[in-house]
Each structure stands twice: as structure tokens, then as C-alpha cells.
A protein has these predicted regions:
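Anionic-ligand-binding alpha/beta catalytic cores of soluble enzymes and soluble regulatory domains
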Residues: 6, 11-59
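Phosphate/ribose-recognition catalytic cores of enzymes acting on nucleotide-derived substrates
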Residues: 47-160
Length: 160
């Protein structure tokens, strides 16, 4: 059986090409080729609660080895809650170099306008746009200020 290759913009559409886009953090182009946003669906786990201490509580998701995670960095995301609601989010994918020396990759998301407890519940995080690479900050205050800028960028994304 012969399968016709699909070309788009002179590029053969393939899972390998789309994986390369996700691994590079090019979420908008990956979504364009996939026909939907790349997402992770995982159960919320307890973290160190560092975000809570700086006024930016996050939900924490583990990334199994076999799951394709985007390039380390900060993303505008849309998060689908167990009750059917959606929230805009700012998501960090990476090793959290400001607060950890571990090489373990985690996914942490601040949910704009959300208050509540989601521990033990499954969320779907859809990646919309990469804002920046993951950075190490000298202080938690510098980290907090940068996350506040990222929150403003996420708000602007969803207002457009």
C-alpha cells in the first residue's frame, strides 16, 4: 500500500518533523502542523510550595520519560480543569534552576484567576506559545518579577 506524503510549505509533514518543533519549543508551528496544540495530561502532585511563598502558587506535574515535553522554558498555556473549566496559564518546563540543583524535569503552571486545590486531579495543559527559555535568577524576588511579566504576556495573548 502506498501512502501519499503530505507537503506543506515545501516540508513533508511527519511525526519526526512535528516532534522536532515541540522539542525546539516552536509550539505555534507544531500546532499548525498537528491541527491542534501539543498537550500534557497528568495528575497534580505536591511540590515544594515555593511559588506559594512568593505569591504565585503553581500546580506541579511530573513528566514521565516516555512523554514528549517541549523545550525547557516558559510558555503561555491553556489548562483544562477536571470540572470542565479552562484557565489561562503560565507554565515552566524544566529543572527550576533558581530553586533546585536537580536535573529532574518538571512542569509547573500558574493558573490565572484560579483559587483552589487540585492535588490528585488530572489536568490537561495545552502549550500555546513559548515566551522565553528557562533562566536561573539570583533571587526569588527577581524570579517573581519575571513571572509577573510572563503573566502579563499570557493575559495579552488571550485578550488578542
Amino acid at each position: 500500500m502506498y501512502k501519499r506524503q503530505v507537503q506543506r510549505e515545501g516540508i513533508t509533514v511527519s511525526s519526526t518533523y512535528i516532534r522536532t518543533l515541540v522539542e525546539a519549543g516552536d509550539m505555534e508551528r507544531a500546532a499548525d502542523f498537528l491541527g491542534h496544540r501539543h498537550c500534557l495530561s497528568q495528575t497534580v502532585q505536591h511540590g515544594q510550595r515555593i511559588g506559594r511563598t512568593i505569591g504565585i502558587p503553581t500546580v506541579n506535574l511530573a513528566v514521565p520519560e516516555h512523554v514528549l515535553a517541549p523545550a525547557h522554558g516558559v510558555y503561555v498555556t491553556e489548562v483544562f480543569l477536571p470540572d470542565g473549566r479552562r484557565c489561562a496559564g503560565v507554565t515552566n518546563v524544566g529543572t527550576r534552576p533558581t530553586v533546585s540543583d536537580s536535573d529532574r524535569v518538571s512542569v509547573e503552571t500558574y493558573l490565572l484567576g484560579f483559587e483552589g486545590d487540585l492535588y490528585g486531579q488530572e489536568l490537561r495543559v495545552e502549550f500555546c506559545r513559548r515566551l522565553r527559555g528557562e533562566q536561573r535568577f539570583d533571587t526569588l524576588e527577581a524570579l517573581r518579577q519575571e513571572i509577573q511579566r510572563n503573566i502579563q504576556q499570557a493575559e495579552a495573548y488571550f485578550e488578542a
